[in-house]
Design a protein with these regions (language model features):
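N-terminal intrinsically disordered/low-complexity leader segments
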Residues: 1-10, 21, 200-202
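Helix-turn-helix
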Residues: 2-3, 14, 22-56, 60
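Generic hydrophobic, amphipathic alpha-helix propensity
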Residues: 11-19, 36, 61-65, 69, ...
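Short helix-capping/turn signature of helix-turn-helix
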Residues: 51, 110-116, 162
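Hydrophobic alpha-helical connector segments
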Residues: 60, 74-103, 156-160, 182-185
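Amphipathic alpha-helical packing segments from all-alpha helical-bundle domains
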Residues: 67-71, 118-145, 154-158
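Helix-loop "lid/cap" segments that line or gate small-molecule binding pockets
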Residues: 76, 92-99, 109-114, 192-195
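Hydrophobic/aromatic-rich alpha-helical bundle segments in the mid-to-C-terminal region
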Residues: 105-110, 121, 143-191, 199-202
């Protein structure tokens, strides 16, 4: 027997996918529930049932995207067999995710509209806290054994991921300047490792 949740999950995702198209085209403020209805084919009632409001759709899309990004990043860390592999693998995973999910990445990195941030602020804070807790759990043993420099976790993350995040932003914002972001994977991965590797690095 097909459960209601099995039926509703694809509907929710279809609405979110349609909303993403609308938001990237018109912005959250410039998008209406009716526009999402037309793009998705879902009834206005269904949209309100699942998300409560347009801002609710925008917030859920932001959280869903952030969750997927964090999961991809953490998976790269957990599957690594060394400190070097974890640092470099997570940089590569970040760039791969941005290319594979370009539309969602644009929304995640460039959506700063007040309605979205305000609606989802507590949930975003919880999600980020969980992410940093898990990333730091991977990081701590490598720091303890001298494989990664002893820095504050957030400073370490900034040195490690800052350049590749900024490069992704430049790629997502490109217009006439066409370039392949993946051409920089090796250079960015090496730079990340060089910036945080400790004396006992391997």
């Amino acid at each position: 027997m097909v459960s209601a949740s099995n039926v509703e999950a694809p509907r929710r995702q279809a609405i979110l996918a349609a909303a993403l198209t609308c938001f990237l085209r018109s912005g959250v403020t410039g998008t209406t529930i009716d526009a999402i209805h037309r793009e998705s084919g879902a009834s206005v009632g269904s949209i309100y049932h699942f998300f409560g409001s347009k801002e609710g759709v925008a917030a859920e899309l932001y959280l869903d995207t952030l969750r997927d990004y964090f999961d991809t990043y953490l998976a790269a860390l957990r599957s690594s067999r060394s400190s070097r592999a974890g640092i470099q693998g997570s940089v590569r995973a970040h760039l791969d995710w941005v290319v594979t999910h370009e539309a969602r990445a644009k929304y995640l990195f460039h959506c700063q509209e007040f309605e979205v941030i305000e609606e989802s602020l507590p949930a975003i804070a919880r999600l980020r806290e969980q992410f940093y807790h898990q990333a730091n759990a991977w990081l701590a043993p490598h720091v303890e054994h001298g494989r990664i420099k002893s820095l504050s976790p957030r400073l370490c993350q900034a040195l490690w991921m800052g350049p590749s995040i900024e490069y992704a932003r430049l790629w997502l914002a490109r217009s006439g300047d066409r370039f392949n972001i993946l051409d920089a994977q090796t250079a960015l991965a090496r730079a990340a490792w060089d910036s945080v590797k400790g004396r006992a690095a391997r």
